[in-house]
Amino acid sequence: MKNLNQVVDALKQGNVIAYPTEGVFGVGCDPDNEQALLNLLDVKKRPKEKGLILIAASIEQLLPYIDLEQLTEEQVNTIKASWPGPVTWIVPVKTSTLPLVTGQFDSIAVRVTAHPQVKAICNAFGKPITSTSANLSGLEPCRSVTEVEAQLGDTGVVIFQGEVGNRTQPTEIRDAKTGNTLRQG
């Protein structure tokens, strides 16, 4: 288990980290490091077509990855009103975003977190990190450091000591263009 500085150093070195979120532990990496993204997909046994979520401390951290010009002012205001919080939005993506982040899609899933430890990681790292649940494919997501160690301990994942929030449901996922809810939260 590592402290904040060690976790940020691990991100800068291209490592995959495990960290607490609003409801479960997540695993993530630097969204601009292709090898780190490949390592993350390997740890999760996740198909690259599925894409990943970016989680950030602020909307400003997401601006290099998202194309808000394709959205109306009302759509952008709706997104901003839901953050920080447990709502993930599917938004248009900038072409400079690595395909391993977007998967088979021409959009990207993004969230501004309210979890203080994730905010601290993103602020110290200076940008968003990828986020997907910390578990091996087919197993339940981890809710404690002990569970992360049991499932992912031999994968080289750097674990950030912390507590998950009290959410029992996954985050809600909504489409920014249509407003449709794709997953209830």
UniProtKB/Swiss-Prot annotation:
Task: Determine if Nucleus is one of this entry's keywords.
Answer: no
Keyword list (alphabetical) reads: ATP-binding, Cytoplasm, Nucleotide-binding, Nucleotidyltransferase, Transferase, tRNA processing
Q: Give the InterPro entries listed for this entry.
A: DHBP_synth_RibB-like_a/b_dom, Sua5-like_dom, TC-AMP_synthase, TC-AMP_synthase_SUA5
| Catalyzed reactions per annotation | L-threonine + hydrogencarbonate + ATP = L-threonylcarbamoyladenylate + diphosphate + H2O
- GO molecular function (one): ATP binding
What are the YrdC-like domain coordinates in residue numbering?
1-185
Q: Where in the cell is it found?
A: Cytoplasm
Q: Name one GO cellular component term.
A: cytoplasm
First-level EC class: transferase
**Principal location:** cytoplasm
Listed under GO biological process in this entry are: regulation of translational fidelity; tRNA threonylcarbamoyladenosine modification
Specify the domain of life of the species encoding this protein. Answer: Bacteria
State which Enzyme Commission number(s) the record gives.
Answer: 2.7.7.87
Concerning its family, UniProt says:
Belongs to the SUA5 family. TsaC subfamily.
Q: What does this protein do?
A: Required for the formation of a threonylcarbamoyl group on adenosine at position 37 (t(6)A37) in tRNAs that read codons beginning with adenine. Catalyzes the conversion of L-threonine, HCO(3)(-)/CO(2) and ATP to give threonylcarbamoyl-AMP (TC-AMP) as the acyladenylate intermediate, with the release of diphosphate.
Q: What is this protein called?
A: Threonylcarbamoyl-AMP synthase
Organism annotation: Aliivibrio fischeri (strain ATCC 700601 / ES114)
> What's the source species' lineage?
Bacteria, Pseudomonadati, Pseudomonadota, Gammaproteobacteria, Vibrionales
